[in-house]
């Protein structure tokens, strides 16, 4: 059954994931994603840099259903995603799944520099609207050195326009996607792993 609880307090709502540097986080659990949200509503995932993952960079949605779910108005914009899906397959820089209501957007993301793993028996994608994905506007995403720009698998109603290697505003997207200048120092932090 699609996840759409009558108690709306159970739904992850209005979360913001912004200005994060997420790099090399899938070493132990290769099927993990840089950022993953199962059934969010009104989530904002923006201005992040996600890189060096063994599977998908950003994943939003679950359930493989065209029926109404708790998801609506999800925003995945202005992210810089590169060197992802390095070992596994059937993933993407940005992967979305199932009916996501209305008003969801995937815009002005810069997806670049990755290829299908030599161990994979199936491809990977820049943007992947998987089974029953609906409710999205997918526009102005720049994809450079990407084996497949956009894949759509049994999707519902979406608006997909002006994406690829030269969408309108490509130079601006390249310059502004990812971590905003006021948070750039996050990439210089050194974190010492705990010793077990």
What are these regions (language model features)?
Residues 8, 18, 118, 132, ...:
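Context-gated lysine
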Residues 1-3, 7-26, 41-55, 68-85, ...:
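Right-handed parallel beta-helix
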Residues 1-8, 28-37, 54-66, 88-98, ...:
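Extracellular beta-strand/beta-solenoid scaffold signature
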Residues 60, 116-118, 147-150:
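Noncatalytic linker/hinge segments flanking ATPase motor cores
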Residues 33-36, 59, 63, 103-105, ...:
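Compositionally biased, intrinsically disordered low-complexity regions
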Residues 62, 131, 152-154:
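A cross-domain feature marking catalytic cores of carbohydrate-active enzymes
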Residues 104, 145-146, 150-196:
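Acidic, glycine- and Ser/Thr-rich low-complexity intrinsically disordered tracts
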């Amino acid at each position: 059954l699609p996840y759409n609880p009558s108690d709306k307090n159970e739904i992850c709502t209005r979360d913001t994931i912004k200005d994060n540097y997420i790099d090399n986080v899938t070493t132990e659990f290769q099927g993990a994603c840089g950022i993953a949200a199962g059934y969010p509503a009104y989530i904002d995932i923006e201005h992040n840099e996600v890189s060096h993952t063994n599977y998908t960079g950003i994943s939003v949605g679950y359930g493989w259903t065209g029926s109404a779910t708790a998801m609506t108005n999800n925003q995945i914009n202005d992210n810089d995603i590169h060197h992802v899906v390095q070992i596994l397959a059937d993933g993407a820089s940005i992967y979305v799944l199932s009916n996501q209501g209305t008003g969801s957007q995937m815009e002005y993301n810069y997806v670049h520099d990755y290829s299908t793993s030599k161990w994979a028996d199936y491809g990977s994608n820049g943007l992947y609207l998987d089974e029953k994905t609906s409710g999205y506007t997918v526009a102005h995403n720049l994809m450079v050195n990407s084996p497949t720009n956009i894949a759509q698998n049994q999707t519902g109603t979406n608006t997909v326009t002006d994406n690829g290697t030269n969408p309108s505003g490509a130079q601006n997207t390249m310059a502004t996607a990812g971590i905003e200048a006021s948070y750039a120092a996050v990439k210089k932090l050194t974190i010492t792993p705990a010793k077990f």
